[in-house]
A protein has these predicted regions:
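Conserved small/polar residues in nucleotide/adenosyl-binding loops
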Residues: 1-4, 171-177
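Conserved thiamine diphosphate
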Residues: 7-10, 16-156, 160-164
Length: 181
């Protein structure tokens, strides 16, 4: 743990260099809205170094923080850039929807050899749910989770949207459907 000034570009660049040297830094953004001031370090450097080095250099880094859609925190604190990051080659994006997801996905992200962006919705910070106690509990990155089985319609959601999709899956106004969430 190193205290840094509030300069997303500086601490992101420092962490990318540390990751290239074998450390596994976790960078915390106060809000993901500020990732744009560290654009070059995240989207050009961290995401591309493995490819630019022909696979010789890994960048095992985690960028995490609140991506706050729907929280009424104002324009400069409410960006949800997960779609942008997910479409950047070399970056992985995770958006936990439960406390167990947060624990298991974060542990997997820290162990991953590529950059991972953890985008958390603060609406979920006070969510109470069971969390597995075993030390080796992880959730593999890149795998989806089905929270309701169905065979007529699928709702694909992430983060807090999982919780708002479940009641919607029981209400279809025109046809009776069996919905997967």
């Amino acid at each position: 743990y190193k205290r840094q000034p509030i300069s997303e570009a500086a601490f992101s660049g420092l962490a990318v260099g540390a990751a290239m040297m074998g450390m596994r830094p976790v960078v915390e953004f106060m809000f993901w809205s500020f990732c744009y001031v560290a654009f070059d370090q995240i989207f050009n450097n961290a995401a591309s170094i493995r490819y630019m080095s022909g696979g010789l250099i890994n960048v095992p880094i985690v960028f995490r923080g609140p991506a706050n859609g729907g929280t009424n925190v104002g324009a400069t604190h409410s960006h949800t850039p997960e779609n942008f990051a997910a479409n950047t080659p070399g970056l992985k994006v995770i958006c936990p929807s439960t406390p167990a997801d947060a624990k298991g996905m974060l542990k997997s992200a820290i162990r991953d050899n590529d950059p991972v962006c953890v985008m958390e919705n603060t609406i979920l910070y006070n969510l109470r749910d069971e969390v597995p106690e075993e030390d080796d509990f992880t959730i593999p990155l890149g795998k989806s989770k089905v929270v309701r089985e169905g065979n007529d319609l699928s709702i694909i959601a992430h983060g807090n949207a999982v919780h708002t999709s479940i009641p919607v899956s029981y209400t279809h106004l025109t046809l009776p459907t069996n919905t997967t969430v």
